[in-house]
Amino acid sequence: PLLQLNQIIISPIHQSVLKSSILEGMMAKKVTAVSFENLKDDSDSYPIVRSMSEIAGSAVMLIAAQYLGSANHGKGVLLGGISGIAPTKVIIIGAGIVGEYAARAALALGASVKVFDNNVYRLKRLQNNIGQRLWTSVIEPRMLAKQLKTCEVAVGALGSQTGRTPMVVTEEMVGNMRPGSVIIDVSIDRGGCFETSEITSHEHPIFMKYGVIHYCVPNIPSGFARTASQAISNVIMPLLLEAAE
């Protein structure tokens, strides 16, 4: 009802999770929708996607720290490490922008970080960007399953250029994880890379399965609205000013 005839909307569309009724309503009113996430710059990259990925990657460790606490039925452990206590073990699946910023945040907190990705170039780039040696591996199911058994936090940060994100963590792997550990599936807007993932919301962000806390909110940056808005403005304003000339 808020849409007007022939209206132009510049907004994130999230086509993969957009309800068909909303799309049909937009078509009926001949709405022109410009999708944030599909805007490219002169270098043929997606600047808004990059900014949102940086926010999501940094945020996942804050979210994980919250749900590891006893108040949220977590393991009651501090994300990171203090003197005399073994550091929290974090597994990151995906070495893109989200994975890089998640690794940065986890390392800054003192966690032990292990990164999986099937693209060796991305793994090398992540190590170079972070500036220190990291434990990295291609996604080999037996190795991944072994590491998931002993981790406190698992982050799904795989991307996909063709549609659905590869589902690399099976239900059996999740079932073998420690009770109270936390899964954050950042890839959920493209299907997710954990077989047990189901879309959640900011109002009801988590659910439990096999004793493991699942956080599967599709748009994590929207939980940090002011920062996300400023990042989007930094990209959109120059484009609008250029188009107006």
What are these regions (language model features)?
Residues 14-15, 31, 38-41, 118-120, ...:
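Short, ordered loop/turn segments at secondary-structure junctions
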Residues 71-159:
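Glycine-rich phosphate/diphosphate-binding loop of Rossmann-like nucleotide-binding domains
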Residues 23, 61, 102-103, 123, ...:
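Generic hydrophobic/aromatic pocket-lining and core-packing "Φ" positions
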Residues 5-6, 86-89, 180:
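Phosphate-coordination loops involved in phosphoryl transfer and adenosine-cofactor binding
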Residues 37-79, 188, 193-245:
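Adenosine-phosphate binding glycine-rich loop
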Residues 128-210:
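Rossmann-like adenosine-cofactor binding region
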Residues 1-67:
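Phosphate/diphosphate ligand-binding glycine-rich loop within oxidoreductases
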